[in-house]
């Protein structure tokens, strides 16, 4: 079908003479054996014919290089084929010269010294390149080969007689104009028989159909990931090599793809050209708009064969399947941690580099990802575009709505193999598993405290800086995190949509309900290795462990008093502030903390949901029940370091320690 150039065919096809130099007297070039296609012609080739074309063209080029050496310049079509791009833009459609006189009219030769006719092909070509013999008469630009000049000359001579009446853009062919006009009309005449999706051109349909057939001929040698296009694998391999040739002139950030740079630049310009027709929300990326649109339709066409879970996008299914296979192709060279997706891997690397290029203009908080900045900004605007159809509750992001919807279905497909606890999201399971491994990669430089999650470290660091950027507009109270502010706002509205089916107690957050329900089940999976005491919650275990170490990392800047918990420090600081923003509606008594108010309100309601299983005594607080149970168990966890005496309560130990201090005095 296509001519393959044999090595012995390479040679001089015309003798060289400086005085009577005729047009294109040079070596047999790649152009002599190349076959060119227009875009329209290319669409009629089936995939096997296209693969054959690529193989033949690349082999021809390799044969030329093997004889001509490195001095042979890479033709444009070869560069395109190697990068997985389609070759319809090559010379044939644009300038198909058949008359030598026409070719000579656009070429002006520069006088060069005389060479013998038996000069070697390599020497002759290197002379051509060094001397740049071909000059454009239009702009005087010089080129080392006639082919390069002809390719350049197309920009001067190509006619574009077909004009779009909508926008004035010109095209070389009526076919190109027809394709372009479909952007204005929205016409998509090519339909996929598999899924019914429509496309503007046959080429787009052919590309789309590969997603149904699963055809992926280009495989990454590093991680085994396969791609439909060679250009995609070139972009992907930069993840492994770290190559980032595209740099932003605004902030200096570099990218592996030019398209990523263009999208990134919208962060600086604020451009969001893609608008949702349903809710009016705008996006900087078309892919984000498409993903967002599926929240309105609730369409999930991609289904996991292992567990039946459905996804909106094909790549989400691919990533999900790694949960079943355990595959983590992206490994951090700094700490050895593996990731299922490149995006998580790149995000993790910023932890080591400390890069947070995205800053909120309202509160100056910085973020590693732009999408995290946009989500955060909703805290200031209060915008909530995603509504639950079950209960009408709204959320700032689609992912939060997705998480919330599982509270109605009760779906928890991800189970911990260590303790059997189940989770609604795979990310929650991964976080939970760190409790069993005890891994704490993230250390606070101020107090050396370590954390299993990076976000917990960043929250903790606000204790040292004292930053409280999120202020309640009702009472003026400030918080170090937006989530704490959202929780606090519910104290003013009194909203408690989550109800315990066991005792009827209601909660403002679903997480609080989950914590509360563990009291009824009696499960205490977290055990102290020092005294074997067990706890319902991991945070209670960590708090308890500070009793053994006597660690109190949280210090009041006013009086120097130290505390085991940041919440205790916050409660203490209200003593210095002398503010009591929380008032009881029954009797008017005011309190410094919301927790004190809720405790007080039980006096009026008489609610005592926590009952002792031994004697039936009821308590208004779970902590009071725990203290009471020590009477039955005989447990005395508080030990005096001076004399070894043990106590049931921390307050009793403190009172006892005063005896030793008074004796010393």
Curated annotation (Swiss-Prot):
In residue numbers, the zinc fingers (C2H2-type) are 134-156, 162-184, 190-212, 218-240, 246-268, 274-296, 302-324, 330-352, 358-380, 386-408, 414-436, 442-464, 470-492, 498-520, 526-548, 554-576, 582-604, 610-632, 638-660
Domain KRAB: residue ranges: 28-100
Asked if the record carries the keyword Transcription regulation, the reply is: yes
The protein's matches in InterPro entries, at most eight in alphabetical order, are given as: KRAB (IPR001909), KRAB_dom_sf (IPR036051), Znf_C2H2_sf (IPR036236), Znf_C2H2_type (IPR013087)
SMART domains (alphabetical): KRAB, ZnF_C2H2
Q: Which UniProt keywords apply?
A: DNA-binding, Metal-binding, Nucleus, Repeat, Transcription, Transcription regulation, Zinc, Zinc-finger
Cell location: Nucleus
Domain of life (superkingdom): Eukaryota
Q: Which Pfam families match?
A: KRAB (PF01352), zf-C2H2 (PF00096), zf-C2H2_6 (PF13912)
Biological processes annotated in GO: regulation of transcription by RNA polymerase II
Q: What GO cellular component term, any one, is given?
A: nucleus
GO molecular function per UniProt: DNA-binding transcription factor activity, RNA polymerase II-specific; RNA polymerase II cis-regulatory region sequence-specific DNA binding; zinc ion binding
Function field: May be involved in transcriptional regulation.
Q: Which family does it belong to?
A: Belongs to the krueppel C2H2-type zinc-finger protein family.
Q: What is this protein called?
A: Zinc finger protein 573
**Source organism of the structure:** Homo sapiens (Human)
């Amino acid at each position: 079908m296509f001519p393959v150039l044999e090595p012995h065919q390479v040679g001089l096809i015309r003798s060289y003479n400086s005085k009577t130099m005729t047009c294109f007297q040079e070596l047999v070039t790649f152009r002599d054996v190349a076959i060119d296609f227009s875009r329209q012609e290319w669409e009629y080739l089936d995939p096997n014919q296209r693969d054959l074309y690529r193989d033949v063209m690349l082999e021809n080029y390799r044969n030329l290089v093997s004889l001509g050496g490195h001095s042979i310049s890479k033709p444009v079509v070869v560069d395109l084929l190697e990068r997985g791009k389609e070759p319809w833009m090559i010379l044939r459609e644009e300038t198909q010269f058949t008359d030598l006189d026409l070719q000579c009219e656009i070429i002006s030769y520069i006088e060069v010294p005389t060479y013998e006719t038996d000069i070697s092909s390599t020497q002759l070509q290197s002379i051509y390149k060094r001397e740049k013999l071909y000059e454009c008469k239009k702009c005087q630009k010089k080129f080392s080969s006639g082919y390069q000049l002809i390719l350049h000359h197309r920009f001067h001579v190509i006619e574009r007689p077909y004009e779009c009446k909508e926008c004035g853009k010109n095209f070389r062919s009526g076919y190109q104009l027809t394709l372009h006009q479909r952007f204005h009309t929205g016409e998509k005449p090519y339909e996929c028989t598999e899924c019914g999706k429509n496309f503007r051109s046959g080429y787009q349909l052919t590309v789309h159909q590969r997603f149904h057939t699963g055809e992926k001929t280009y495989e990454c040698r590093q991680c085994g990931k396969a791609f439909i296009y060679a250009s995609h694998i070139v972009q992907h391999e930069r993840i492994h090599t770290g190559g980032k040739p595209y740099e932003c002139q605004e902030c200096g950030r570099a990218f592996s793809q030019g398209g990523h740079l263009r999208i990134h630049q919208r962060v600086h310009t604020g451009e969001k050209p893609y608008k949702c027709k349903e809710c009016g929300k705008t996006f900087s990326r078309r892919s984000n708009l498409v993903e967002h649109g599926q929240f309105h339709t609730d369409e999930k066409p991609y289904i996991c064969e292992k567990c039946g879970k459905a996804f909106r996008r094909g790549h989400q299914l691919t990533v999900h399947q790694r949960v079943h296979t355990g595959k983590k192709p992206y490994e951090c060279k700094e700490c050895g941690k593996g990731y299922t997706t490149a995006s998580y891997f790149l995000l993790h690397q910023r932890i080591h580099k400390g890069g947070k290029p995205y800053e909120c203009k309202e509160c100056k908080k910085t973020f590693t990802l732009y999408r995290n900045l946009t989500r955060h900004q909703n805290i200031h605007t209060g915008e909530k575009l995603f509504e639950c159809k079950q209960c009408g509750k709204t959320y700032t992001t689609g992912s939060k709505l997705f998480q919330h919807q599982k509270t109605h279905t009760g779906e928890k497909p991800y189970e911990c193999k260590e303790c059997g606890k189940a989770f609604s999201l795979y990310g929650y399971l991964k976080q939970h598993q760190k409790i069993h491994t005890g891994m704490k990669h993230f250390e606070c430089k101020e107090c050396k405290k370590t954390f299993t999650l990076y976000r917990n470290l960043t929250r903790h660091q606000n204790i040292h800086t004292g930053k409280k950027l999120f202020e309640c507009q009702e009472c003026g109270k400030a918080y170090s995190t937006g989530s704490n502010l959202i929780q606090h706002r519910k104290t003013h509205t009194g909203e408690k949509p989550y109800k315990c089916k066991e005792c009827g107690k209601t909660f403002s957050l679903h997480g609080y309900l989950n914590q509360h329900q563990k009291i009824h089940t009696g499960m205490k999976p977290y055990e102290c290795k020092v005294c074997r005491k067990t706890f319902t919650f991991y945070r209670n275990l960590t708090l308890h462990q500070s009793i053994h170490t006597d660690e109190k990392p949280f210090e009041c800047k006013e009086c120097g008093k130290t505390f085991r918990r940041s919440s205790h420090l916050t409660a203490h600081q209200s003593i210095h502030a002398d503010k009591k923003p929380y008032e009881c509606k029954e009797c008017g008594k005011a309190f410094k903390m919301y927790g004190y108010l809720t405790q007080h309100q039980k006096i009026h309601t008489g609610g005592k949901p926590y009952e002792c299983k031994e004697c039936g005594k009821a308590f208004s607080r779970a902590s009071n029940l725990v203290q009471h149970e020590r009477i039955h168990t005989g447990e005395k966890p508080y030990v005096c370091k001076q004399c070894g005496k043990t106590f049931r309560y921390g307050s009793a130990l403190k009172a006892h320690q005063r005896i030793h201090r008074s004796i010393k005095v």
